Design a protein with these regions (language model features):
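Conserved beta-strand in the GNAT
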Residues: 57, 66-80, 87-92
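A conserved beta-turn-beta hairpin within the catalytic core of GNAT-like acetyltransferases
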Residues: 80-89, 98, 148-150
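Active-site rim helix/loop that mediates acceptor-substrate recognition in acyltransferases
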Residues: 28-67
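Conserved catalytic-core motifs of GNAT/GCN5-like acyltransferases
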Residues: 123-125, 135, 140-157
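A short beta-loop-alpha structural element at the N-terminal edge
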Residues: 10-26
Length: 161
């Protein structure tokens, strides 16, 4: 699928329920995008915190079909660190959708939802190659580079509101 075809598909972003079909699709996408390229499996991850997280999904649909024709093309989750701060984790967009605004739309949706819930900031650990993406979205890099799951990361933060 080309970027032009991807841009022709309608994109909707919404919160998805834990432990239902959309969550299972999100797990599969997280595995394909974030774990398999590193020779890892999401089955080896500690997913116990997922039950308390806020899950966001981006869904593509071409034409005027019904919701059942939608497919998950991006996902992320937010975990509360305290009453003011959420950590954004597991941001994954299918390869064919990168560069089409899918990631940006998910992050912006997550920020609005976080603010609605009374949170004042989002923090994240960005893979080194994703830092420019987050900087465009006004996230500030903090501290030195560190390794997580064997690859370089930076801590980033954005104040909401």
């Amino acid at each position: 699928m080309t970027k032009q075809q991807n841009q022709a598909e309608a994109l909707s972003v919404r919160q998805i329920p834990f432990a239902e079909a959309e969550y299972e699709q999100a797990l599969k996408l997280r595995d394909e995008v974030l774990r398999r390229p590193l020779g890892m499996s999401i089955a080896d991850d500690d997913l116990s915190g997922d039950a308390d997280a806020l899950h966001i999904g981006a869904f593509a649909r071409s034409g005027a079909g019904d919701a059942h024709a939608e497919r998950l093309v991006g996902t992320l989750l937010l975990r509360a660190l305290d009453g003011r701060t959420l950590q954004m984790k597991q941001v994954a967009v299918e390869k064919a959708r990168r560069g089409t605004g899918t990631g940006r739309d998910m992050v912006r949706f997550a920020e609005v939802r976080a603010a609605e819930l009374g949170y004042g900031e989002i923090v994240l650990h960005a893979r080194e190659n994703a830092v420019p993406f987050y900087e465009k979205l006004e996230y500030i890099r903090e501290g030195e580079r560190f390794e997580e799951i064997g690859i370089p990361h930076y801590r980033m933060r954005r104040e909401l509101g």
